[in-house]
Amino acid sequence: MFQKNISLQPLNTFGIAATAKKFSEVRSVEVLKEIVSRHKDLFILSGGSNILLTKDIDKPVLYLNTKGIEIIDTDEESVWVKAQAGENWHEFVCWCLEKNFGGLENLSLIPGNVGTSPMQNIGAYGVEIKDSFVSLEAMEISSGKIKTFTKKDCAFGYRESVFKNALKGQFIILNVTFKLTAKEHIINDSYGAIREQLKSDKIVEPGIHDISKAVITIRRSKLPDPNEIGNSGSFFKNPVITSSHFAKLQAQYPNIPSYRSVSYTH
């Protein structure tokens, strides 16, 4: 079940040459449940884009590599898509675009895997996963039981979720379900950089594929390919301030952009 002294260099986007003294690549929920029943203190590794390995890992490393994307429901306007945790995020977005499903195009080229996307409510260019998130299934490490989490259960905020706070380290996310548009797509080109790129591409009436292409072009102009130069993608948080503080700034700078954070209400 576990291999010994496995290099983690190809499994983290910085390309750090750390070693796992005990390593298991998990491709099924059944195997995961068996491991969790025997080991509680695990190092969970997914897409490897939000970690910086500084030394070899002594505790057992569990590399979650479950695959699968399926359409679980549809109606006239929407489609519900479930993706397993080990699916590469950008490849999942591309799969949705190939099917002409809208809602995730602004999140193109973000490194990492589907399973970790809800943990910090990943977002870019005016869109967060909570906007199309329906639910996820996760395994409780202490009991091995599988629980379904709704959007409300996840307590999404600005780069926040319950899995970074109250339930940190207690669950392993197994799959995520999204509700996407099947037609009548809602285009989000609110960011100036996207509008400028669309203008440069001579796109007057952009569709979801145009938005994705613009985002990819912008991201590639800012960040190197992690396969060539190790990096963790665009990694930052905008400042979170009080409403009264923002009011003062807005009085001085009327056009200052802002975003109301549901996780901060003071």
Residue ranges and their predicted role:
Residues 227-231:
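Short coil/turn segments at secondary-structure boundaries
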Residues 2-136, 140-142:
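Anion-binding (especially nucleotide phosphate/pyrophosphate-binding) glycine-rich loop
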Residues 265-266:
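Conserved small/polar residues in nucleotide/adenosyl-binding loops
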Residues 251-255:
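Long, low-complexity interaction regions most often at the N-terminus
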Residues 117-218, 224:
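FAD-binding subdomain of flavoenzyme oxidoreductases
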Residues 236:
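Active-site-proximal loop/hinge segments that shape catalytic or ion-binding/gating pockets
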Residues 31-33, 186-187, 244-248:
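Short, conserved charged micro-motifs
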